[in-house]
Each structure stands twice: as structure tokens, then as C-alpha cells.
Amino acid sequence: MARPGFVLEVDERTPPLLVHQGEGFRLQKFPLGSRVIYPPDSLPKLRWLRNHIRDALDHPHGSEPLRELLTPGMKLTIAIDDISIPLPPMQSPDIRQLVLEEVIELAARRGVEDVKLYMANSLHRRMTADEIKHAVGERVFRSFYPKDLKNHDAEDPENLAYVGKTDQGEEVEINKRAMESDLLIYVNINLVAMDGGHKSVPVGLASYRSVKHHHNVHTMLHSKSYMDPRPGRSAIHDSCRRMGDVLMANGLKVFTIETTMNNNTFPDPFAFMNKREWEWSLVEQGTYLAAKKANDMGPSAMKHQIWTRIKSPAGVTGIVAGDTDAVHEQTLATLHRQQLVEVDGQSDIMVVGLPYICPYNVNSIMNPILVHCLGPGYLFNLYRNKPVVRPGGAMIMFHPVPNEFHQVHHPSYVDLFEEVLTETTDPSTIESKYEERYATDPWYIHLYRKSYAYHGVHPFYMWYWGAHGLDYLGDVIVVGGDPKTCDRLGYRAASSFRDVVKKVSPAVVNIEA
């Protein structure tokens, strides 16, 4: 049985602790009395995955078995989570591949011939052929790509269906083929509690016309937690749930397949990162020293290649299928067993190490706006009831925050950074003054549809994602961050951890740089 997570209180015996810092890492001493949150150990991975998949399809929650829903002559569409999850990408075979092979084989046996597959990339960049192949596997790729396996196109008016409005006036528009199908199967990987459920179809297969109703400043500021989909807790999930209700009321039949992963994130030679520091063996201590030395001395381009090529050995901990709500309830229960840690009381300062990866820079670059999304956005919001830091407290992040952008993937990010953030960092002002122009710009739309660029509006959403955190926090300081870049973001930069902690808490002593 996996050990539960716990909160370590730093004392004289506590060794330096591992901290991520972009495409780097370090061991850091923390002040006495600091509390360090450790997640539960990795849950045991499921063995014989194909058997578990078949069992989930044959014994779904709140639905007939999938075989009973598949009939000759029907129109079947399968939507698949895109490259934004899991993080890092899985080692082959990806769980999506195994699920798809079982679903498609079952459909063939039931006489279903009209089958289309879509990567549910919403306003994310299109996946390349190699990226799609890694997710779905060689067999599915060769059978369907490119005619019947495609990226969803949120700007293709010929393949979008306007469905209606929610009782809150939110417009619902999704992939036309999906809406007109006799059955839509959604294949999901649930990395965190924000994923899955009704956030899958109404977001993954939607257009900007629809997404803008929940990816906005008002929604972000009125969410108590992005990671708590209980009604009334997350405005974005409440909106997606209303949209899901509209889709079902208009005849869309969805069979949801959700999967969960354990915490076995990093492969060798970085497997020591999966363990608590005081439990490192002598070999793992030596591996840390060698890996850090090589990483620190290597050219930046080489380091980037090493990190972006990492494939995670994470194991599958759950496979659930059936009705979306019934499935997601089971999914969240498994996620919580793997991720929840009880923390007693809030702190003055929250410290996080930002890793090299987030949902929007897979095979790409972590640009400054994505640093903002990952820090005050995702990591600040990794709580269920209350933030771990008090209102008005400080957030300290470790990251170099270089002024670097992927010119193909993030063109509108560059322009937002250079044009918009030089004028204002206020999310509401940015939204009202600039969003529509970027969202409807013909060049950005062309790059989204024909190249591999994120939609022109996407960096705005990444900026809004940090709105709740910045509204709540009193200070954000980045250790090792580029001063000019941090200033553009509205942060403070510090050269060392000792300096930054003394700035926000002068009484702190006994700390190393």
C-alpha cells in the first residue's frame, strides 16, 4: 500500500531539498520551521492494461456497455486528449493508444465503418504527425491518418456546429462532426482535478466563440480553486457543466473514457527526483551530482534537447468508462488518493520550483507568459479548500525566466509580451482593450490553422490564468529570474534565496543561498 503524503517541518536534521528551476535543478536549504509538502507515494500501476480497458468498456458507470452502443451504419466520432497532457509525455505505449486500439477493434467487430478521430486540441497548436503517432500508436495512425484522424480546427466554419446557449447566455459551439454523430467517445488522461469531466468536450472540441465564455478574467477571479470542480467552487467548471448540459439536451450522446496516472514521473537518470531526499541511496546521490554537473555545464541548446526528450514511466492507476458525470466521480476519487495532502493552516510565504514543462510547451519553450501561467496560475491553485499561503502573502518561485519564445508555436505570445505587457499587466484592461483584436487577427488564425501556432488569443488566457493568484497574493518574487523579464511581468527578481526571504521576512535566519 502506498504511503500517504505528509508535511515535513524543517529542523536541524533536514537535508537540502530538491527544487526545480526550469531546465535545471538544485538542492536548497530552507529555514527552520518551514513546512514542505510531500505527495503520497506512487499508487501501484495497473497490470494487464488491455484487460482493464476491456472491463471498463464492458462494465461502464451509468451507461450500457460500449458494445451495445455500437451498431452497423452508425456515425462514430472519437475525440482524444491532445499533447498538453500527460506531463511529461508517456513512454510508449501511451494509454490513449491502448484504449483506442480496443475501442476501434470493438467497433469493427460490431460493424461500424464510419469512424473519424479528432485530437481535441481546442485553441492549442496543432499536433505534428509524429506527435499524433506517439499518442495513438502506429497501428491507429497508419489506419486513419490523415484523412480520418485530424486535429480539431476551432476556426473551420464548415466543421463547427452552433448548438445553443446555456441559461447564463453562454454560446455553445463545437466540432460539427462530433455533434452530428450517433455516438461521441472521448478518450481522456486526467493529470489533475481540473481535467476531464465536462471540461473535455465543451472545451477540447470548441471554438473561440464558445471558449471565451469561461476562459476570461471574471471566471478566473470567481473561482475559489481551479482544481476543485465541485459546484460553486470553480466558475470555469460550472460553465463547462452548463455547456455539457446543453450538448446533451440537444442530442449529443457521449461515452467517456477517463484514465489516471501515478507519481512515477521521471525516468533514469532523473529517477531520484521521484523520491524523498533523505531516502536517496548512495547511487542516487551520485547520480544527482553527476546529472547536475552535466546539466549545469552543458550548452543551453543541448540541455533543452535532453529535457524535451524525456518520456515519463508513469503507470496507469485507473480506467473508468461510461456516463461523463459518473465516470468523473470515480476518476477524482483515484486522483485524490494519489495527490491530496492535508495541510494544517496557511503560511506567510509559498515557495515553488517551476519545472521545465507545462501543458503548453511540450516539445517547445517555456516562455515568460507560460512561467506566469504555471506559477501564479497552476501551482498557486493546487489546492482544494484554501491556498497554502495566507491572503496578501508572498509567492517565491525558482526559474530563470529567460526572454525566449518559440517563434512557430507562440507567435502571438511574443506580440503580447512586447506590445501589451509594456502598457499594462492588469488582466481586465488587457482583456477589454486587446483580446478581441488578437483573437480575430487573420494572420494569427492562419498560423493556427495551417502552421503549428497556438491560437492568437491563447496567451491572453495564460495571463488570465494567473489573475486569481495575483489578486490574492501580495508579492511574487523569482529566484534567479532575469530582472528585465520579471519586471515586465510585474514580478521582483532576486539573485539568491537568502536575499528574497530576507526581503519578505527579515526575521528569517539560518538559510543558505
Predicted regions and their residues:
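N-terminal amphipathic/basic leader segments beginning at the initiator methionine
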Residues: 1-53
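N-terminal glycine-/serine-/threonine-rich phosphate-binding loop
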Residues: 40-73
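N-terminal active-site beta-alpha-beta segment that forms phosphate/nucleotide-binding
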Residues: 63-125, 373-388, 393-394, 399-414, ...
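Short loop/turn segments at strand-loop or loop-helix junctions that form parts
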Residues: 75, 79-84, 188, 259-261, ...
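Well-ordered mid-protein domain cores that form the structural environment of catalytic cofactors
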Residues: 93-172
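Conserved, well-structured core segments that form the ligand-binding/active-site neighborhood
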Residues: 142-346, 353-356, 376-381, 387-389
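C-terminal catalytic subdomain
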Residues: 364-365, 369-477
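N-terminal activation segment of mature serine protease catalytic domains
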Residues: 497-513
